């Protein structure tokens, strides 16, 4: 029996060695594409700043960040014991916090045109709307969770059009976008699993672009797709690897958050500036960014999935 086990182990080792030397063990084509696009890029001229939270507050696993019209910073994190929603001023001073016991996996946070704050839970698929002071105003149960045994099987992000339409990225298991009216009544849904136009493999982020179209970070397909608010496919840019986020600045500058498929999650993250008319990559910042917010002055606020609250301010 010992000899047989040794033979089995030897065969496994030989197979693993063969795979590592073969195309099957090589980098996947998407990762090769991403590296070919990002490696030649210049680093963007920014200053890295780490904000100190005052009074001292332990941030744990920052999942998403948003900013509001007052320049405040809204952080959604995953504390072991504390409030997941924290509002700070631009200097890092805590203004208020809330949400303890209301979340399983806090995932997305956004501010709507009226200044209200919305959160998305990736485990329960519950979307919550809060007033700027933290009073709960609305709850949307997205539902239709295919496999409740999975920790991540729910919604990921939310976006708004100026006329009050709400779009939820129901991304981890359902590969769809669900539209609601301002009262939380479901209007329609669109999208399905796959690699073709209008198909997704993890709808990880959604945002309304300068022209009013919906831009979606199709994470595992390594691309951005964009659509009309009614769900009609308009186009796509494929960058390869994993594409976590897409964001626009107040002046229309476009950024995406990228990561190769074949390395640890703490390595080779980039926030990349992209020409919004062509999809050409223009420059990058080396930082992990699960989600991304952009301040009114163009500062980048990456959600680092750590306790570090960072911003990257453009140099004047």
Spans of features found by a protein language model:
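Bacterial N-terminal signal peptides that target proteins for export
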Residues: 2-13
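Bacterial N-terminal signal peptides
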Residues: 11-22
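Initiator methionine at the very start of the polypeptide chain
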Residues: 1-2, 26
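Eukaryotic scaffold repeat domains enriched in small/polar residues
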Residues: 27-316
């Amino acid at each position: 029996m010992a000899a047989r086990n040794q033979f089995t182990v030897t065969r496994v080792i030989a197979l693993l060695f063969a795979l590592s030397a073969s195309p099957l063990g090589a980098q996947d084509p998407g990762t090769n594409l991403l590296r070919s696009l990002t490696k030649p890029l210049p680093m963007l001229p920014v200053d890295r700043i780490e904000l100190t939270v005052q009074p001292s507050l332990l941030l744990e696993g920052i999942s998403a960040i948003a900013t509001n019209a007052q320049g405040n910073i809204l952080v959604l994190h995953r504390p072991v014991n504390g409030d997941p929603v924290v509002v700070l001023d631009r200097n890092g001073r805590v203004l208020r916090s809330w949400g303890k016991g209301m979340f399983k996996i806090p995932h997305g946070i956004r501010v709507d045109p009226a200044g209200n704050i919305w959160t998305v839970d990736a485990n329960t698929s519950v979307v919550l709307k809060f007033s700027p002071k933290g009073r709960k105003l609305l709850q949307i149960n997205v539902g239709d969770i295919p496999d409740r045994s999975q920790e991540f099987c729910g919604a990921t992000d939310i976006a708004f059009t100026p006329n009050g339409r709400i779009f939820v990225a129901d991304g981890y298991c359902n590969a769809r976008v669900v539209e609601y009216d301002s009262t939380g009544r479901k209007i329609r849904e669109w999208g399905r699993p796959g690699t073709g136009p209008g198909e997704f493999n993890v709808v990880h982020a959604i945002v309304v672009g300068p022209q009013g179209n919906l831009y979606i970070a199709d994470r595992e397909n390594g691309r951005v797709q964009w659509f009309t608010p009614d769900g009609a496919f308009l186009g796509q840019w494929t960058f390869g690897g994993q594409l976590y986020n897409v964001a626009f600045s107040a002046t229309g500058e476009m950024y995406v958050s990228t990561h190769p498929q074949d390395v640890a999650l703490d390595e080779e993250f980039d926030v990349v500036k992209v020409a919004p008319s062509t999809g050409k990559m223009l420059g990058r910042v080396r930082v992990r960014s699960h989600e991304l917010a952009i301040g009114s002055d163009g500062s980048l606020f990456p959600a680092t999935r750590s306790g570090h609250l960072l911003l990257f301010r453009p140099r004047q």
